[in-house]
């Protein structure tokens, strides 16, 4: 008789779509974690690329990951499916072109263990590819989150956070599903905690989803959905949110080349248009 399967402490969940060789780096980073009480759950979101499919087959055959294959529905739906199939009480999403520092789980898991009021643990993020530097994430607070996405998707959170937030919204196919998720989580009263060290890496390459999502039409549609969904939250925190927006715009204005591409500007313009529409209706 085989021994009963134990429940891991952490489920790393990964949506994959035609990631190619970037996937290999992400898989290695999970295997290199010093925190060993974990599992890796992958949802292949309809990949057609032979390299991607071969790497996933190898990961499944070796026992490094459980792989679930589905038709292409976008990363939000893929993450939701992965969490449904995951067994652990703690969840950490990892995109296939990003990776983790070896001590990421070792440094973040104890924070959730120590304080049940903390629902999300985020870390500083190393930027690679088209941008280089360090993203000092946070704060995980509603006014700041209304101004921009202050937390990277590769943050550790409790499964209960995902349940109470309603999961990742599959309407956000192009991007911002993480931003929406963090807003929903904060609205439920969850606190965040930042580990001020680079423990996750975000790679933005020429084929990255975020690059495509910054096209004006896609960005405007996404912001309209985000603002409409969280309108009540915005109204309750209007004064503080405007203060956070002001700070963001002042920081962005130091680089005029980037100001109109800044998420805070897009959000402010979308909110303005929606408010103008409301005034015309009254």
Regions found by a protein language model. Give the residues of each.
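Glycine-rich, basic loop-to-helix element that forms the pyrophosphate-binding segment
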Residues: 70-86
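Boundary detector for helix-to-coil junctions that initiate low-complexity/charged tails
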Residues: 217-282
């Amino acid at each position: 008789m085989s021994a009963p399967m134990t429940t891991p402490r952490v489920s790393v969940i990964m949506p994959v779509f035609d990631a190619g060789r970037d996937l290999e780096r992400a898989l290695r980073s999970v295997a290199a974690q010093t925190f060993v009480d974990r599992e890796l759950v992958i949802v292949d979101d309809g990949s057609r690329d032979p390299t991607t499919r071969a790497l996933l087959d190898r990961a499944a055959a070796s026992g490094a990951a459980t792989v679930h294959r589905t038709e292409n529905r976008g990363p939000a739906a893929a993450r939701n499916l992965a969490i449904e199939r995951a067994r652990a009480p703690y969840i950490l999403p990892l995109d296939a072109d990003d990776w983790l520092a070896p001590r990421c789980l070792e440094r973040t898991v104890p924070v959730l263990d120590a304080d049940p009021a903390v629902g999300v643990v985020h870390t500083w993020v190393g930027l690679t590819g088209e941008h280089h530097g360090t993203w000092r994430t946070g704060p995980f607070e509603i006014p700041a989150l209304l101004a921009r996405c202050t937390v990277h998707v590769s943050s550790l959170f409790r499964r209960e956070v995902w349940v109470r937030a309603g999961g990742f919204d599959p309407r956000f196919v192009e991007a911002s599903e993480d931003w929406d998720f963090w807003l929903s989580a904060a609205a439920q009263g969850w606190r965040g905690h930042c580990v001020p060290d680079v423990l996750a890496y975000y790679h933005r390459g020429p084929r990255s989803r975020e690059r495509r999502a910054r096209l004006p039409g896609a960005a405007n549609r996404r912001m309209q959905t985000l603002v409409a969904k969280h309108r009540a939250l915005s109204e309750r925190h209007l004064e503080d949110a405007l203060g956070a927006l002001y700070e963001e715009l002042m920081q962005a204005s130091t680089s005029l080349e980037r100001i109109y591409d800044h998420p805070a500007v897009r959000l402010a313009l979308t909110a303005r248009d929606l408010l103008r529409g409301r005034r015309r209706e009254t």
